[in-house]
Amino acid sequence: NYNFLYYLAYCNLTCAVAREVVEHYGDRTAEHPVGTGPFRLAFWKRSSKMTFEPNPNYREDLFDGTPPADDAAGQFILSRLKGKRLPLVDKVEVYVIEEPQPRWLAFLNNELDFLERVPNEFANVATPNNELAPNLRKRGVRMERTAGMELTYSYFGMKDPVVGGYEPEKVALRRAIVLGQDVGAEVRIARKNQAITAHSPIGPGALGYDPDFRSTATEYDPAKSKALLDMYGYVDCNGDGWRDLPRKSAADECRPFTIEYASAPSAQQKPLDENWKKNMDAIGVNMTFRKAKWPDLLKESKAGKLQMWGLGWS
């Protein structure tokens, strides 16, 4: 496997470190990253700030690149930096600003030099018609628009008694929920057209990505969703407007059926939740939301306590 060494050094996947590091830090190993990159972690305050300083042991590495001839911005950067030794700066400070409005205002107020991405809520203001706004251009702001190597998805807790399992009715339930979710509306409304529909687990920029591949995994068909739910007994048996769990016979009592989706209490998450709620209402599925901070949800997820949650990788 020619990619094996790459996998060992790819921290999003494995990030292998010396045994002594793990033995010394134990469960806190992730708080003490060890690597051979251009920077090392100098300060970290959870959910607040990280400071990186140059790694004195970093190898000799000179800036280089091969931007296309028609990439004016790339050619300009190359002309200024080609041949200079990396890293180019003495310190990098990363601030964790969870809410989009304070993050955007901090950038406008020159408190930040770089914003990784424009918050979706301000995309139409900052980049009308996907072009940098004239007022920002006058201030010397530059924008680089790329398809990020990132993929977001929603998962089902496969050990959950309601949505998990491999019985035919459970498989049908998960398929029905997927068929009832309008991903196109999520892209247009919740993500302000700053995303594309994923048709595979491989995102743009990753080896194996095929922009022409189309999958039925993101098919939106509420009629088919309702038919599947009806077929496997997820029907409204008490007339309250919501579907109930399947019954073995008509004489059995109705059992309420609710899907709980975990999500963070953020402005960015709100339109995503609203899209889910609207879509599930349309097929008669009662969806509620489990609100908690991301680190807390991660702990619950690892413990197998979440029915559904949205995650991603980049």
Residues covered by each model-derived region:
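Short, well-ordered beta-strand elements
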Residues: 37-40, 50, 89-95, 255-264, ...
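Surface-exposed binding/hinge segments that line
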Residues: 1-22, 27, 35-51
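Short beta-strands and strand-coil junctions in structured, solvent-facing domains, enriched
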Residues: 2-6, 59-61, 103, 113-115, ...
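Append "and occasionally in soluble cytosolic enzymes with long acidic Gly/Pro-rich linkers
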Residues: 43, 48-64, 76-83, 167-278, ...
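A structural "hinge/loop" feature
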Residues: 2-14, 36, 155-157, 164-167, ...
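Periplasmic binding protein-like
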Residues: 131, 261, 279-314
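Short, hydrophobic alpha-helical packing/hinge segments within bilobed ligand-binding/sensory domains
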Residues: 103-104, 173-174, 297-301
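Extracellular/periplasmic solute-recognition and catalytic clefts
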Residues: 42-53, 80-81, 93-160, 184, ...
